[in-house]
Amino acid sequence: MKPIYFSIVIPVFNRPDEIDRLLKSLTFQDDNNPFEVVVVEDGSTDDAKQICESYSNHLEINYYFKPNSGPGDSRNCGMSKAKGNYFLILDSDCVLPSHYLSTVRKALSTSYTDCFGGADAAHESFTFFQKVVNAVMTNPFSTGGVRGRKKGLTRFQPRSFNMGISKQLFEATGGFGKIHPGEDPEFVFRAWNLGFKTRFVDGAEVFHERRISLNSFVKQIYKFGSVRVILNRIHPKYQSRLFLFPTVFTVVWVLLIVLLLISFLLNTKAFYLDFVYLGISLYLLYSVLFFLSTWLISKSLQIAVVSVPLMFVQFASYAYGYIRSSVKLIGVTNNHIEAKLPEFFFKDIA
């Protein structure tokens, strides 16, 4: 096998301050092997060109500007221009620990794979809400271990905020598709179809900052639920009941509350109340387990307390997107999905 030469591909859109922190973290890597950085500006109005140029004496860095066509196409652009034989895909809102490159290099040298993913973590400098969001987005009780876990409830799917792709795999698949969000699992599904393997690299975590408010969090999770329906239609053999859980969780919870309110408003002890109380008790138990696991992982009582209601918000947002897309795609063939839900696809550049 040829020596691994990393090309770090970073799409960026109107976030020069973020790319500055990421590039700075790359200058502190303890890996002594050469690597290149490829930054692809996706049609930004607030570009990062000067910031990238300021690192030219510290990093082998190449900057490209292109019209806005989405993060997937930007990654493809970067990989097509990169000179490495292994691409490390990162989001611009990530910061790397100093051991990241050496950990990945050691893992690939020991057990090579054409595609890997790593965990995301919260840095101590993150805001309180960012830490809460990270806790909810990585807790196995709210994600099934799909994100940032070696052992989840489903086959590990690398995510593009922290993802490695060999040049061979990129050339075989053609890179990421037009769907967004969801371009990363869709890419992984096509890789699996071609016989390529994926793996989780323990220790190759990134600090994923997620510049996010409650409103943007709700919108993001809504989109995740929406595109999951599309992914299930395009790649049916990779469907998992796990991705139905937030929707079932939310629908049953709403039903329990409605039944309880009906009984209260009618001032009667309905025959179903015992089942309602049992159901609510199970939800309380689940919330306690989620709280305890978050407390154990984050080692913060405050984060654990706030994460519980945010978990309910996450499930409800996901469920709304999942149900809405499911209804809109009734009777729609796969060839017409993009026409029916165009907001989840980037257009080709003419």
Model region roles, listed by residue range:
Residues 4-7, 36, 186:
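Cell-envelope/extracellular polymer assembly enzymes that use nucleotide-activated donors
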Residues 24-34:
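Short, acidic, metal-binding catalytic loop of nucleotide-sugar glycosyltransferases
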Residues 25, 41-50, 68-69, 91-97:
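A conserved acidic beta->alpha catalytic loop
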Residues 66-82, 103, 153, 157-160:
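Glycine-rich, basic loop-to-helix element that forms the pyrophosphate-binding segment
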Residues 87:
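Short aromatic/hydrophobic "clamp" motif used to bind/position activated sugar donors
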Residues 98-131, 205, 209:
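Conserved donor NDP-sugar-binding/catalytic core segment of glycosyltransferases
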Residues 177-239:
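Catalytic donor/gating beta->alpha subdomain of glycosyltransferases that bind UDP-sugars
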Residues 249-331:
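Membrane-embedded multi-pass helical conduit in multi-pass membrane proteins
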